[in-house]
Amino acid sequence: MSELLSFALFLASVLIYAWKAGRNTWWFAATLTVLGLFVVLNITLFASDYFTGDGINDAVLYTLTNSLTGAGVSKYILPGIGIVLGLAAVFGALGWILRRRRHHPHHFGYSLLALLLALGSVDASPAFRQITELVKSQSRDGDPDFAAYYKEPSKTIPDPKLNLVYIYGESLERTYFDNEAFPDLTPELGALKNEGLDFSHTQQLPGTDYTIAGMVASQCGIPLFAPFEGNASASVSSFFPQNICLGDIMKNSGYQNYFVQGANLRFAGKDVFLKSHGFDHLYGSEELKSVVADPHYRNDWGFYDDTVLDEAWKKFEELSRSGQRFSLFTLTVDTHHPDGFISRTCNRKKYDFDGKPNQSFSAVSCSQENIATFINKIKASPWFKDTVIVVSSDHLAMNNTAWKYLNKQDRNNLFFVIRGDKPQQETLAVKRNTMDNGATVLDILGGDNYLGLGRSSLSGQSMSEIFLNIKEKTLAWKPDIIRLWKFPKEMKEFTIDQQKNMIAFSGSHFRLPLLLRVSDKRVEPLPESEYSAPLRFQLADFAPRDNFVWVDRCYKMAQLWAPELALSTDWCVSQGQLGGQQIVQHVDKAIWKGKTAFKDTVIDMARYKGNVDTLKIVDNDIRYKADSFIFNVAGAPEEVKQFSGISRPESWGRWSNAQLGDEVKIEYKHPLPKKFDLVITAKAYGNNASRPIPVRVGNEEQTLVLGNEVTTTTLHFDNPTDADTLVIVPPEPVSTNEGNILGHSPRKLGIGMVEIKVVEREG
């Protein structure tokens, strides 16, 4: 209803101003600004819905000021361009309509009415209401009743007898199991669900709506609210260090806790969270690649579900035979948005909906088959009688190709339990949420029936039942939950450990690189993650007087304040204010100690603008002084005009990437020398090794042969035509996720370049 009212007010404002208000520059600008705000808010809501499937939620506040990178980002480029073009077109059309009668005399009354209607349209819009509520949640002091509802359980289970297998299905919400809405989509896993305790109304709350947040909520009984964006949790050294979570209790009770997934454990700090709370045995893409049957059988995120669940079964067998009490947690990935992935071993590879194939539904049907196969192996084993199997979604599905169909249904998270010791078949329609999952499992295992804000759905009362406005209540508790991190409020001295790549201050430890905004009573960490912008882009969003400490590779800050370090990949510390003074210090000891030294200086806005503009220069446009192309730093030498076909810098250098261009092409500002030696330090990837690699300058071509290890080769060129471009053509680029950023499409690697140098020859 509010959408219709908001749009009606918007339309009325446009029509009244266009036909009655007349000519006045101030009223035109004011009305266009407010109407433009209405458009921006609603496009933001549309874009947020596209990415999150949940409107402008808590995570979007962070994303509004940072780049969205990571999972399948290329899939979102076209919609993003469409939004920008649409926004420009709407603004242009809006301005044209409002100025239709600009030659008529100004009418104050109609101008005022149009402006008031425009303001009303903004106030009534759902986007404005959502943003207002989120901003309020950032500034609240907390809710006094938090302590009454947050309950710490006993640290042990008195007489543990059951092993636990806990399966997180990526985005595998219960809605998919509605056979009337989606016929024969989940027959195998749906049949198993119907054999156990099926909790049919598991609500998703703020702070539980992405993978690491869903894991924290289900194991600790609290939403993931932090002094930083949740998916950047990989930079912290401990995770809710004071809280008692399910893994802690199980470890204290004699369990060995295992976690197996196909993606990199570092993503979003899963490794930090699990190690902080009782898990000593973790297996992700790096740990599994040496043990899986086919280490090259991977999707954009890591190993496919069939591979991961096969490894989980092997681990279940091994642990069961040992007689050791254990828990085995696993997380699938094939159903990750926007499209999902199809394992090669499943029978259900294709699912049609609305008369055409749907990739997301196909991925769901395949993944549920793999999960069901894993569960049936456990059920058929002699150890099932001592095992509790839990299957849950980590969160509701985000915007995938099935999302518009899911939204037509009553959406809930998946949570069901199959007990080998005491088979129970029942559908429980009690109102609950993700935070109740851990407490319910703890209750089944013989422990307490509460865990944080979670309550057992078998013997307790969920917060979702106690509070009708549970979403608003959860946001009201946000400051209380953030305080559980015991995060420092000041930063005066700090220590950098180069061996561990960590910074420590005021009792807290963070992984490097790191950017910190430091104020009188708050230290705000801004880590670099797969979902955040590079730190220099985040720093560019700081206000002129904001105090910052930035710890990163020297070359990243050298172009601003320390050109002598432009080629250094060591750690450096920069601190100061963008509109004031900045200093850069080279970290030259294994254990390096520093102090903050912020000066209250006069702000220079010209300096501020120059710093911001320089920080926002994209990597390929950065230039440095050097007599060769050094590939392990961003940018290129000043003599290079442009280059293509080259991937991002890594610690050793850069790969060629045929996804960015079939050839490595380096164009210089001036013609290359008439006679020169080309000194190439490089290696080959895969089948490109020991094969002739054409290297061209103008009409002359030489052959380069590389091995899998780095070597230096000198090629001799004559350049009578004054060519200015160097071209290298890898013979057989290989599609691979090796060394790739998690969630990005595979790169096509050919040669790995460390350094290229042009040396003019005499004569």
Swiss-Prot record:
Keyword presence, Transport: no
Where found? Cell inner membrane
Q: Which GO terms describe its biological process?
A: glucan biosynthetic process
Provide the membrane topology annotation: Multi-pass membrane protein
Q: What is its main location?
A: membrane
EC code(s) of this entry: 2.7.8.20
Q: Where are the transmembrane segments?
A: 1-21, 26-46, 77-97, 108-128
Pathway assigned to this chain's UniProt record: Glycan metabolism; osmoregulated periplasmic glucan (OPG) biosynthesis
Against InterPro entries, the record matches this protein to: Alkaline_phosphatase_core_sf (IPR017850), DUF7024 (IPR054288), OpgB (IPR020881), OpgB/LTA_synthase_biosynth (IPR050448), Sulfatase_N (IPR000917)
To which protein family does this belong?
Belongs to the OpgB family.
The protein in question is named Phosphoglycerol transferase I
The organism named in the record is: Escherichia coli (strain UTI89 / UPEC)
Gene symbol here is mdoB
